[in-house]
Amino acid sequence: MSRRETPTSTISSTPTGTRTPRRRLSRKGHPVRRSPLIAKNSIFTVFDLSFEILINAVEENSLDIIKNYLRGDSFHQTAKWGLNVPPKTDFQGDTLLIKAAKKGKFLIAKALLEAGAYKEIVNKLGETALICAVRHFRVETLDLLIQYHADVKIKYKGQNLLELTLEKYSEKTKNFTLRIVQSLVAAGVELWHSDGSQIMASDKEIDEIIRNARNLQIIKKEKREAEERARTKKSKQITLQRIQRDLEYISKRLPFEENILTTPDFPQLFFEISKLVEIISDSQKENKEEFAEASISLIDALKNFGMILEKRDVPGEVKKEDTTLSRNNSLSCLSSPR
């Protein structure tokens, strides 16, 4: 019995051995609720006739059949495929969306995506729907999948999508390749090889698109890094100013002769000074001029505390050997820039 023949035990109105049109089966809703046995080369396998109708509908671009099955459908799991329900696939591991992407069936792919079809399922060849659209030059379907946020960072056999696109380049496919590259670049595809080298195209027009996009990415990256450095600098400056105020306040309030190590303010002060020393030390490594003035202005204030820590034992949990405020340590890191 061929795959397109309907078993007599399933639909009694069909004579044995005759073919039943798929369209007529589809209009009956779910004609087969159980999986009949289909013989192939004398080997019986379980075959889902309902899903086969859908697969054939995709190949023949029968949008009405797909839409009928998507309305109140109980077995096309759509977005649930990404959770605990395994997706329905054909023998190649293709879902309906992957099949639509391969064949370039734009309207069917759109109907499936609108119904919530999961985009990142991988077939037995390691392809997602987006990879299939790239490999088969399905530009409109590719744009549609990108619009539905398909993952453009995915790799196929170690290659990113831009490498895969350029690998299939030829003079006959130049226009398709150009449009695919434009779409992928706009979507944020990776523009470097895995070893960090720049991806380049043999075609000058395509290579210029990639080069311009890469330069733009570099500019944006440098801008983000500059903004981050500015935020870090501002944060450090605010911290320095706050600690300076604390030092000046406590220095005025506590005479040098008084044992400040026994005062309630000392633990917090000690923490603030330690933090300050660390900030200035790190900042001088990055930019010696940036915090030079702040470092010099605090040497005198910290010098007194350093001398006190040298002369006296620190009470409580604060131990002399644990501090960074000994004269040899704290003052050396706060010395004028070298």
From Swiss-Prot:
Residues 197-242 form a coiled coil. InterPro entries: Ankyrin_rpt (IPR002110), Ankyrin_rpt-contain_sf (IPR036770). Residues 7-19, 325-338 have a biased composition (Low complexity). GO terms for biological process: symbiont-mediated perturbation of host transcription. SUPFAM superfamilies: Ankyrin repeat. Residues 20-31 have a biased composition (Basic residues). Keywords: ANK repeat, Coiled coil, Repeat. Residues 1-31, 319-338 are annotated as: Disordered. ANK repeats lie at residues 92-124, 125-157. The keyword Repeat applies. It holds the Pfam family Ank_2. The keyword Isomerase does not apply. Gene3D superfamilies: Ankyrin repeat-containing domain. This is Putative ankyrin repeat protein CBU_0781. It comes from Coxiella burnetii (strain RSA 493 / Nine Mile phase I).
